[in-house]
């Protein structure tokens, strides 16, 4: 409250006009992001992660019914584990990278990426009804996706981009992610 010496919350801040030099530096930083191979590698990685994420979300129940013989109720239950574990992975991604790996996100991103591959192999390559194996696959997949959404989908790009162009880095990765998600629908629908 203002009576305690705090500023009013309803007063709009004055927008400072950027000088020509600041504008040129800002534009240069954004172009620099587009020229960074690491940003494009992150964007491609995020696109592939979104392909696998939306493939499981879109086709997981059908796959479990058609290929493994689950009932609709059991298949839906197994697939519903994935987003719940994704929330948990997202919640703990910062703790994992900051506390366990000292702020380095590349090592946990690799670990959780490999965990996703392992989970997909369990899910797709173990034939027949093995309820607990499929549940384990969705737990691992969901946790991995939750962490990777945070790392690949944003934090790693912001970490390596110039501070005044972090929005451009997030934009490149975000666009690639949703292109991957859209392509998954087209590719798997054929």
Regions found by a protein language model. Give the residues of each.
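Juxtamembrane intracellular "pre-TM" segments in multi-pass secondary transporters
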Residues: 3-42, 67
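Extracytoplasmic gate region of multi-pass secondary transporters
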Residues: 35-93, 149, 153-154, 181-188
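Cytoplasmic membrane-interface "Motif A"-like loop-to-helix N-cap segments
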Residues: 98-113
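Paired intracellular helix-loop junctions of major facilitator superfamily
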Residues: 102, 156-166
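C-terminal ends and interior cores of transmembrane alpha-helices
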Residues: 114-128
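Hydrophobic core of transmembrane alpha-helices in multi-pass small-molecule transporters
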Residues: 131-155
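A late C-terminal transmembrane helix in Major Facilitator Superfamily
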Residues: 163-190
């Amino acid at each position: 409250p203002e009576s305690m010496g705090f500023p009013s919350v309803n007063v709009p801040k004055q927008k400072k006009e950027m000088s020509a030099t600041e504008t040129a530096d800002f534009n240069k930083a954004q172009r620099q992001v587009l020229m960074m191979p690491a940003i494009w590698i992150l964007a491609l990685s995020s696109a592939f992660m979104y392909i696998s994420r939306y493939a499981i979300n879109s086709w997981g129940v059908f796959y479990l019914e058609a290929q493994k013989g689950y009932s609709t109720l059991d298949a839906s239950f197994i697939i519903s584990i994935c987003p719940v574990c994704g929330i948990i992975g997202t919640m703990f991604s910062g703790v994992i990278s900051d506390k366990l790996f000292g702020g380095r996100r590349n090592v946990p991103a690799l670990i959780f990426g490999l965990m996703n591959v392992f989970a997909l192999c369990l899910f797709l390559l173990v034939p027949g009804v093995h309820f607990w194996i499929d549940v384990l696959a969705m737990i691992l997949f969901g946790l991995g996706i939750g962490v990777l959404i945070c790392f690949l989908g944003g934090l790693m790009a912001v970490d390596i981009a110039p501070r005044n162009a972090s929005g451009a880095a997030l934009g490149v990765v975000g666009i690639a992610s949703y292109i991957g998600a859209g392509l998954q629908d087209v590719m798997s629908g054929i």
